[in-house]
Amino acid sequence: MKKFLFLLIFIFSLSFSEEISQNNDLDFLDENYLVEEVQKDNFETLSIIQGKKIEAVDPAQIKDNYSKRVLPLIYQTLFSFDDEGKTVPNLVEKYRWLNGRELYLQLKNGVYFHNNEELKAVDVKNSLEYIKENGTLREIFTEMSDIKILNDAELVIKFEEEDNTFLEILTSRITAIVKREDEKIYGTGKYLIKSFDNNSLVLEKFKKYEENDVYPENIVFSWEIQDSQRFISLFNEEAQIICDVDKRALEYGKKYGILTEENIIKEDRDLKTLALTFGNQRNYTREMKKAIESIIPREATSFFPKEVCESSFSKIDVSIDEKKSTELIEKSNLRKHIKLTILNTEKHSREAEEIKKVMKSYGIEVEILPHNVESYNQKIEEGDYEIALFTIPLAKGGILFNIAKIFMSDLENIEIYNSLSPFLKKLKEECERENREIIEDKILQLIYSEMPYIPISHFRDYTVVSPDLREIFYEWEKK
């Protein structure tokens, strides 16, 4: 009864407390440290609840991190990163550059798709060519000119120009190798897709996977947008793992006894940027954007997090100068009424209220427009808003991949991406890492000067694991 009372207090506080709101890749699943260690007799089915819906399971068509999270369980990539961040072969047995424009690959033997057909060179060719023609990020494959099959296990990828970033690109989950037959898609990973609908994704262990002792038998992914509801599911033992937990919600969970020392709390590896983006309903000049930037409270001192790119030229000043801000507002003729579109979550509501409060002190009224997931996603995709709070996921695969993902997929701003072509070409041609970092920083400086969005903060969410998995978790930690 006492624990139940704590839960009610927690949910009430999370939703209505003035402190919270005055009126949000399963890293460990990548590393297998829970999945492979869970004993079958204890956890035949592992239940995971994340913050948003899985929209697609075709790697080439995925745009969001919530869908991307499940990819390592179903598919494999040609290359991956080791613990030190170096690019290493994955589905590839051997590789070498024949020259600056030809990459030789020899595939591993004994790798099977979920339809029980063995992986062959033609499957790699078909996958990469599909991405180039139909993929969400097809622009990053424009330099790939041809793929020559030598035999079932060997092939050569040819390029129009030198591309020293291509191996990094092939580590990305969206470049996973798949087999497409009619409307079906098969991977080579630990789990195959048992069912997928609007409510859940159910995965089943693939018997022919090279490591056949993977447990549990099934993994069920479902989704719930509100942190509080995911906590309830964990509390009621309806899930063993909840993802995408906001730091503030985590603190309140601890404060009210919903989370205890028995829970495992893991900070996600993947970074996100909370940003203020600009839609098509009104034309905001660069001067207007700079005026807004000078007003709102921000933590991001760089356009990308330092973990993605060390900033020198692209540092951002987050200090507040009221006199300067007032001058920028007057000079830019910034409107006195702004409509702010948000996703109807505790995190977005809290951030929106903070923006509204500070803007009001400068005589600017902010109308907050909350939307459910479907409506919000449609607004963002179509640019049908004035300004919006938007969470931009940042992926492994280097700055080139992130730039392509943000401007070709997340924000669909092809003009900015095309304007960077000379610098991106130079980045692909540069071999020395130090020189590439200088080019990367300069690219970010150029992007930021165009103000495509205002980065408010860079952050990581958290994953919370049930105490039932505690022993399994710590056994992995010892390894």
Where are these regions (language model features)?
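Gly/Pro-rich hinge or "lid" segments in bacterial periplasmic/extracellular proteins
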Residues: 4, 162-214, 218, 226-229, ...
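Detector for C-terminal structural segments
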Residues: 26-30, 289-316, 347-354, 380-479
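N-terminal lobe/hinge region of extracytoplasmic solute-binding protein
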Residues: 49-99, 129, 186
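A structural "hinge/loop" feature
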Residues: 52-68, 91, 117, 166-174, ...
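Aromatic- and charge-enriched surface segment that lines or borders ligand/interaction sites
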Residues: 94-136, 156, 284
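Surface-exposed binding/hinge segments that line
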Residues: 96, 100, 139-180, 190
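Ligand-site clamp/hinge motif
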Residues: 208-252
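Ligand/substrate-recognition segments at binding pockets and active sites
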Residues: 329-394
